[in-house]
Amino acid sequence: MSRDFSREKRLLTPRHFKAVFDSPTGKVPGKNLLLLARNNDLDHPRLGLVIGKKSVKLSVERNRLKRLMRESFRQHQDSLVGWDIVIVARKGLGDVENPELIQYFGKLWKRLARSRPIPEEKSEPAGVDSPDA
């Protein structure tokens, strides 16, 4: 899988965001943000960011956060295959320094990857064609 952040790896329409907000299958709360995720049945993850003026006042800070989130997502996307992810920023996130944020996002991605339900293996009943028969 390429480690780019092309258009296909972004949530673009309000419908995509609404689907994640309405029925998230994974939820990782953090101190200053909330990470919501939903299975997307694709071979790549998609990311959407919600950083409002109420939670982070200065546009410089909002843009810095978006840049760091996208870069962290790009680096960890191999472990996030099949998720639509929305990150919702909360108050105080803009006050956190870059190195701390990078480490924080790394931990959140790992927590999200661990929260994925493990698919059950399909066992075939012992029949005529099975080696147990």
From Swiss-Prot:
Tell me one GO molecular function of this protein: 3'-tRNA processing endoribonuclease activity
Record flagged with keyword Nuclease: yes
SUPFAM superfamilies attached here?
Answer: Ribosomal protein S5 domain 2-like
Swiss-Prot/TrEMBL keywords: Endonuclease, Hydrolase, Nuclease, RNA-binding, tRNA processing
Q: Which reaction does it catalyse?
A: Endonucleolytic cleavage of RNA, removing 5'-extranucleotides from tRNA precursor
One cellular component term from this protein's GO annotations in UniProt: ribonuclease P complex
| One GO BP | tRNA 5'-leader removal
Q: Does the keyword Cytoplasm apply?
A: no
Q: What is its EC number?
A: 3.1.26.5
Q: Give the matching Gene3D superfamilies.
A: 3.30.230.10
Q: How does it assemble?
A: Consists of a catalytic RNA component (M1 or rnpB) and a protein subunit.
- Which HAMAP family would you find in this protein's record? RNase_P
Q: Supply the PANTHER family for this chain.
A: RIBONUCLEASE P PROTEIN COMPONENT
Q: What does this protein do?
A: RNaseP catalyzes the removal of the 5'-leader sequence from pre-tRNA to produce the mature 5'-terminus. It can also cleave other RNA substrates such as 4.5S RNA. The protein component plays an auxiliary but essential role in vivo by binding to the 5'-leader sequence and broadening the substrate specificity of the ribozyme.
| Family stated for the protein in its record | Belongs to the RnpA family.
Output this protein's name. Answer: Ribonuclease P protein component
Q: Which organism is it from?
A: Pseudomonas savastanoi pv. phaseolicola (strain 1448A / Race 6) (Pseudomonas syringae pv. phaseolicola (strain 1448A / Race 6))
